[in-house]
Amino acid sequence: VSQHLQKLEEQVGVTLVQGSRSGCQPTTRALAFMPHATALLDMHARALEALHGNRERVGASSNIGTYLLQPFVRNYLTTANERGEVDLRIAANPDVADQLLAGQLDAAIMEWWLPHPDFEHRLWRVEPLVLIVSPDHALAEAGCIERDRLVDLPMLGGEPGSGTGRLLTEYFGELGVPRSGMQLGSTEAVKQAVRAGLGVSLVMASAVQDEVRSGALVALPIPGLEKRLQLIWRKPPGNLHPPGFVRHLLEEADLAG
C-alpha cells in the first residue's frame, strides 16, 4: 500500500498522507482530492457495467417511488425479453437530485427539477393535488375546495424538499400560503395524522387512492393545483438512445396521451 501511495504522490506532486505518532492522517489536499477520486472510481465502475452488465440505476422521489412507479417497473421487466435489471432507489427529492448529479443514477423521476446542461428532462405526468380530511371533518362533504377557502386552513406538513412549498407559493400568489401545522416528515405519517383527526393536508391524489376507496379518508379536488412530475436522464454521448427504462416511461406517457 505504501508503495502505491508513494507512486500516487509522485504522480500528483503533493503529499497526500501525513504521518505522526498517533498514526497517519490525510492532508488537506488529500481531502480536497478524495471526492474527485471517488467520482473517477465510480465512473470506471459504471463504464465496466455498461460493457458487461445491463442494470439501470433509477432514482425516484419518495412519493413517486412509493405510490406511482412500481407498476411501471413491473411492466418494464415482464413485457419484453432480454431486459436488464432496474435498481430502484427511493429517496427524498433533494437526495435524488444529488445522486443524479454525482453520477450515481442513470435516470430519475422527481417532483421538481432545475434544468441542467448535462441532462435531458421531460414531463412524465401531471398529478393533481388533493386536500385530505377525515370522514367526520366539517369539510368532508364540501366537494371541491376553492383557493380562497383553502388559504385559511392550517396544513399538516409532509416530506421536506418535495417542492410542494414552492408550488403553493406560486398557486396562492398574493393570498399567501396556508399556515403550517405539524411537520411530520412523510406522506404516510400525514395520512395517519389526518385519519386521527389531527388536521388536514395536501397530497398527490395517487397517494391516497386506497384510503379513499376504503372510506378511511376523503380527498377533495382543488382546481388548478397539480404537480408536474419530471423524468430526467443524463445526456447520452453521440446519438445513443436514453436508458431502456426511460424509453419505456416515455412510450407509456405517449400512449396515455
Per-range role (PLM):
Residues 7-26:
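A short LG(V/I)-centered, amphipathic sequence patch enriched
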Residues 11-12, 33-55:
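Alpha-helical linker/hinge and terminal dimerization helices associated
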Residues 54-117:
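Central regulatory/effector-binding core of bacterial HTH transcription factors
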Residues 57-59, 129-130, 145-165, 253-254:
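Short loop->beta-strand "edge-of-pocket" segments that line small-molecule binding or catalytic clefts
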Residues 68, 218-257:
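A late-sequence structural motif
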Residues 92-97, 101-105, 110-111, 163-217:
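Hydrophobic hinge/microswitch elements
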Residues 116-155, 243:
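Flexible hinge/capping segments at coil-to-helix
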Residues 154-175, 239-247, 255-257:
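Secondary-structure junction motif
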